[in-house]
Amino acid sequence: MPVLGPERRLLASLSSAPPAAPRLGLAANQTNQTGPQCLEVSIPDGLFLSLGLVSLVENVLVVAAIAKNRNLHSPMYYFVCCLAVSDLLVSVSNVLETAVLLLLEAGALAAQAAVVQQLDNVMDVLICGSMVSSLCFLGAIAVDRYVSIFYALRYHSIVTLPRAGRAIAAIWAGSVLSSTLFIAYYHHTAVLLGLVSFFVAMLALMAVLYVHMLARACQHGRHIARLHKTQHPTRQGCGLKGAATLTILLGVFLLCWAPFFLHLSLVVLCPQHPTCGCVFKNVNLFLALVICNSIVDPLIYAFRSQELRKTLQEVLQCSW
């Protein structure tokens, strides 16, 4: 956990850091060379805490609602539940990290450097693992929806509970393993490129599947329109509504995740270039966007379900 230097987030250590302080933030890489004036967005600790707490509450409610309602005990909602757990871990790690850093800076918590380093490693693994698992479950949800549309009659024989369980177990195991290796070898170029390639693969998978689903939905809409002789209004409505949904799904994904992975790419491509250094200075902003994704995910993938919203109301009533 970097307690020195201008960068306060754990994943700031993903950059190439100076030998004297290998776990400091990206801004520590900057030298006294003349370069372009940089716009650095400062993210207050209070904002990190607020985002983490909002995400924490949202995702706890999603998990509680799915656990309470047996009608939601299906592979589709299990994937949504695991996505909520992944986002929950992102929130928990962020809240814990921010709280510990504030206590250390205020002198209210005394800890040896070795203890802080071990805590740093644990937090790094937790954050990286939750990020990897979150991306995996976003892809799994896309695959599940694709199968439900294109193989509707065979869906329940293809996506069974045992298969979904094995997929979920594999994702969690792979996330823990990959995050551990990533933190251990974060200074290797191949590791950073592997993580960036994984993000690009997930983006391509989601884009291909959702675009294909949109095309099938519009094709089905045109078929219905021909039967009712209302072709043009239906086609236009299908295109606008489908494009809006697709824009929300992929737009939010890109907005929240792409800046962070662009940052990793630049760490590999131009670690010492002044212009890239301007990007490095905003790593806290990129991590805040990742946390924002944990807030938006329940709104897109969970709360749109009428059954889940009804159960959520029951959970809230019981809590009061």
Curated annotation (Swiss-Prot):
GO MF terms held by the record: melanocyte-stimulating hormone receptor activity
User: Could you list which ranges are Cytoplasmic topological domains?
Assistant: 67-75, 144-166, 215-243, 304-320
**PANTHER family annotated for this entry?**
G-PROTEIN COUPLED RECEPTOR
| Descriptive protein name | Melanocyte-stimulating hormone receptor
Task: Describe what happens upon changing L102P.
Answer: In allele MC1R*2 and strain Jeju native black; may form a constitutively active receptor
* Protein's organism: Sus scrofa
Subunit details: Interacts with MGRN1, but does not undergo MGRN1-mediated ubiquitination; this interaction competes with GNAS-binding and thus inhibits agonist-induced cAMP production. Interacts with OPN3; the interaction results in a decrease in MC1R-mediated cAMP signaling and ultimately a decrease in melanin production in melanocytes.
- Glycosylated residues are N32
What's this protein's family per the entry? Belongs to the G-protein coupled receptor 1 family.
Checking SUPFAM superfamilies in the record gives: Family A G protein-coupled receptor-like
Asked whether the keyword Cell inner membrane is assigned, the reply is no
Residues passing through the membrane, by range: 41-66, 76-96, 122-143, 167-186, 195-214, 244-269, 283-303
Q: How does it sit in the membrane?
A: Multi-pass membrane protein
